[in-house]
Amino acid sequence: MSNKRIYELAKELNQPSKDVVEKAQQLGINVKNHMGTITTGDEKKLQQAFKKPQTNKKPAQQASQKPATNQPNEQKKQETKTKQQKNNRNYQDRGQGSGQVNQGKNQSTNQNRSNNGGGNNQNRQGATQSGNQNRQGSTQGGNQNRQGSNQGGNQNRNNNNNRGKFNNNNRNRFNKKGKKGKQQTSNKPAVPPRKFRELPEVLEYTEGMNVADIAKKIHREPAEIIKKLFMLGVMVNQNQALDKDTIELLATDYGMEPQEKIQVDIADIDKFFEPEELNPDTLVSRPPVVTIMGHVDHGKTTLLDTLRHSRVTSGEAGGITQHIGAYQIDIDGKPITFLDTPGHAAFTSMRARGASITDITILVVAADDGVMPQTVEAINHAKAAGVPIIVAVNKIDKPGANPQHVMQELSEYELIPEAWGGETIFVEISAKFGQNIDELLEMILLVAEVEDLKADPKQRAIGTVIEARLDKGKGPVTTLLVQQGTLNVGDPIVVGNTYGRVRVMVNDLGRREKSAGPATPVEITGLNDVPQAGDRFVVFEDEKTARAAGEERAKRALLEHRAITSRVTLDNLFESLKEGELKEVNVIIKADVQGSAEALAASLQKIDVEGVRVKIVHSAVGAINESDVTLAAASNAIIIGFNVRPTPQAKIQADNEEVDIRLHRIIYKAIEEIETAMKGMLDPEFEEKITGQMIVRETFKVSKVGTIAGAYVTEGYIRRDSGVRVIRDGIVIYEGQLASLKRFKDDVKEVKMGYECGAMIEKFNDIKVDDVIEGFIMEEIKTN
């Protein structure tokens, strides 16, 4: 015999498929729904199970709407009297439309059913018996006639039954009805009483917990705790914070020992950098981190370029490194990480930050220039950080190079060469031609071996931000130096006051990496904002904790900033009152990287001009946008863009609102311009200085553009931003500004003597061949 499906067996048993599935699962038969198949043996088990009396019945239907298929279930009810059972069957037949009802008794039966609350509200389990018993009672005489000879004893007995059934019917009257008006009894199990749970022996609490929090900890209802506190003389609600004394009083009354839980400040990431956090058993050797320092143009970037075999300098404006770069090179299987700090005085803070995360400092000194101001600053930073110094005497290939003079000058700063009995390593090199570079690398590895540098690669990564910027397509891009542990893609991370998850990790060669060990520089994306250069970063165990820590740090930083900017004391009260007469320059700084923005802001704030000071209204990374222009218009500020350009919309808005936007690629030019503007507030005196002359050799007329002069510079130089005079036959016929200055279709800032160029003059097109164009600038006469 083939297997049978559940719904087929349900039809045979006259049972719902759902009940058959439930019964099969109770018997251990593996079926899931009505389409499941069962064997012949399982079929017999189910048939046997459904032959037993059913204790749980379905909700009753109206007596007039009972289907014939439910008759077998009705016959299984417990019988009390044979006569009542016969009457039940007769009543069921009448409810099924059989028509076999005594016409003489119909009126009295309907009357009894109406008096007893109506058959429509009767429960299925008692509908047949109660209906027939009511018909046999003494309600209104109809049944008395039918039971004439038994009015005495049977009437009293049946009246008692009717009272019980009447009460049941009244209760059922208010039962909910189904879709077709059928009565439904609740099949939901009764709510079990709450299981009693013992009180804990110790109550761990934190100050500020409320009643609801304590109720969860001690497994009690909040109302019970509120009542107990009321009895102890403390009136609270369940959401009210409780102080330490109240919590301890409550715990003592319950017989528990109160124990205050020390809260860990998740926003404090500096604790992860403590030496005590390191496990001595898992420490291994790590690569050294080397910082290259020195005066501007002494060859730091050229040295690093030689080490990396790339042209870093060619991409730098003015030959000066604009932001910290981190690179790693491999020497005979031993990696070395290099940090290239800018050499200009404006980058003092960045250089100090570089020294704080480095292991070895290479001090680059030009053999022809000797010790310069930034050289001394670099020495002081390295000594303050306790970092060993290796002196690289550069440019020994140049005529006039005097390495001995450099050694003599540095000895005044306690950097005495080993050849003179000191401890400082000196290496004479030529970064341009790669002379003695191998010897310098050997010295670095030697010093690193002596320093015995260790790190734990197994812990969660910690480190420092080298640089950060806002990329148009990638969002915040951050260069990190891993100091301890291993940084992996996907790690939840907190960087300064920002947070996120490491989405993409790229090494210094532009290749994607999945992990980065100690002393490895990488560039990551995935942060919610641009951090500050020099911020520390920590990897957290989960993203939720990292987010909470980052948001808390950002909140604290904002509150601290507001407190600093709004704080007034008796010491500065007089100065604050005088600020009404104080002239100031409001400046908004936008730069390509955070380090440059910081350096420019620090330099501008150091400008000391009597009666005038610089106020940095806003400093950020990224292109100059409409929000910056709106802020500048509201605060009457000048926008300085460093290596960034304004968006087209921002440029249009700036023109409409007459906001001054100054764009620069060299940092000291920006400082110089602001300083000049500040001194202008003091009504300085200027004098004219002729920079050069050029002779017009050809003219080109371009429609909708104007006249372009093809000229040859005969004296000095002509700058794009200088003023010009057009001289014809010794007479000045026009004075104005250059509209453009080009060489070979490229815009240039200046053209020197002996070179040809193309020039356009603003609002002047009457240029003739052999005209002389004289360039001049207005120089300020320095005031003492």
Swiss-Prot record:
<comment type="similarity">
    <text>Belongs to the TRAFAC class translation factor GTPase superfamily. Classic translation factor GTPase family. IF-2 subfamily.</text>
</comment>
<feature type="region of interest" description="G2">
    <location>
        <begin position="319"/>
        <end position="323"/>
    </location>
</feature>
<feature type="region of interest" description="G1">
    <location>
        <begin position="294"/>
        <end position="301"/>
    </location>
</feature>
<dbReference type="InterPro" id="IPR053905">
    <property type="entry name" value="EF-G-like_DII"/>
</dbReference>
<keyword id="KW-0342">GTP-binding</keyword>
<dbReference type="InterPro" id="IPR036925">
    <property type="entry name" value="TIF_IF2_dom3_sf"/>
</dbReference>
<dbReference type="GO" id="GO:0005525">
    <property type="term" value="F:GTP binding"/>
</dbReference>
<feature type="compositionally biased region" description="Low complexity">
    <location>
        <begin position="106"/>
        <end position="172"/>
    </location>
</feature>
<dbReference type="GO" id="GO:0003924">
    <property type="term" value="F:GTPase activity"/>
</dbReference>
<dbReference type="Pfam" id="PF00009">
    <property type="entry name" value="GTP_EFTU"/>
</dbReference>
<feature type="binding site">
    <location>
        <begin position="340"/>
        <end position="344"/>
    </location>
    <ligand>
        <name>GTP</name>
    </ligand>
</feature>
<feature type="region of interest" description="Disordered">
    <location>
        <begin position="31"/>
        <end position="198"/>
    </location>
</feature>
<feature type="region of interest" description="G5">
    <location>
        <begin position="430"/>
        <end position="432"/>
    </location>
</feature>
<feature type="binding site">
    <location>
        <begin position="294"/>
        <end position="301"/>
    </location>
    <ligand>
        <name>GTP</name>
    </ligand>
</feature>
<dbReference type="Pfam" id="PF22042">
    <property type="entry name" value="EF-G_D2"/>
</dbReference>
<dbReference type="GO" id="GO:0003743">
    <property type="term" value="F:translation initiation factor activity"/>
</dbReference>
<dbReference type="InterPro" id="IPR009000">
    <property type="entry name" value="Transl_B-barrel_sf"/>
</dbReference>
<dbReference type="InterPro" id="IPR005225">
    <property type="entry name" value="Small_GTP-bd"/>
</dbReference>
<dbReference type="InterPro" id="IPR044145">
    <property type="entry name" value="IF2_II"/>
</dbReference>
<dbReference type="GO" id="GO:0005829">
    <property type="term" value="C:cytosol"/>
</dbReference>
<dbReference type="InterPro" id="IPR027417">
    <property type="entry name" value="P-loop_NTPase"/>
</dbReference>
<feature type="compositionally biased region" description="Polar residues">
    <location>
        <begin position="56"/>
        <end position="69"/>
    </location>
</feature>
<comment type="function">
    <text>One of the essential components for the initiation of protein synthesis. Protects formylmethionyl-tRNA from spontaneous hydrolysis and promotes its binding to the 30S ribosomal subunits. Also involved in the hydrolysis of GTP during the formation of the 70S ribosomal complex.</text>
</comment>
<dbReference type="InterPro" id="IPR015760">
    <property type="entry name" value="TIF_IF2"/>
</dbReference>
<dbReference type="InterPro" id="IPR023115">
    <property type="entry name" value="TIF_IF2_dom3"/>
</dbReference>
<feature type="domain" description="tr-type G">
    <location>
        <begin position="285"/>
        <end position="454"/>
    </location>
</feature>
<protein>
    <recommendedName>
        <fullName>Translation initiation factor IF-2</fullName>
    </recommendedName>
</protein>
<keyword id="KW-0547">Nucleotide-binding</keyword>
<dbReference type="Pfam" id="PF11987">
    <property type="entry name" value="IF-2"/>
</dbReference>
<feature type="compositionally biased region" description="Polar residues">
    <location>
        <begin position="93"/>
        <end position="105"/>
    </location>
</feature>
<dbReference type="InterPro" id="IPR000178">
    <property type="entry name" value="TF_IF2_bacterial-like"/>
</dbReference>
<dbReference type="InterPro" id="IPR000795">
    <property type="entry name" value="T_Tr_GTP-bd_dom"/>
</dbReference>
<keyword id="KW-0396">Initiation factor</keyword>
<keyword id="KW-0963">Cytoplasm</keyword>
<feature type="binding site">
    <location>
        <begin position="394"/>
        <end position="397"/>
    </location>
    <ligand>
        <name>GTP</name>
    </ligand>
</feature>
<feature type="region of interest" description="G3">
    <location>
        <begin position="340"/>
        <end position="343"/>
    </location>
</feature>
<keyword id="KW-0648">Protein biosynthesis</keyword>
<feature type="region of interest" description="G4">
    <location>
        <begin position="394"/>
        <end position="397"/>
    </location>
</feature>
<feature type="compositionally biased region" description="Basic residues">
    <location>
        <begin position="173"/>
        <end position="182"/>
    </location>
</feature>
<dbReference type="Pfam" id="PF04760">
    <property type="entry name" value="IF2_N"/>
</dbReference>
<dbReference type="InterPro" id="IPR006847">
    <property type="entry name" value="IF2_N"/>
</dbReference>
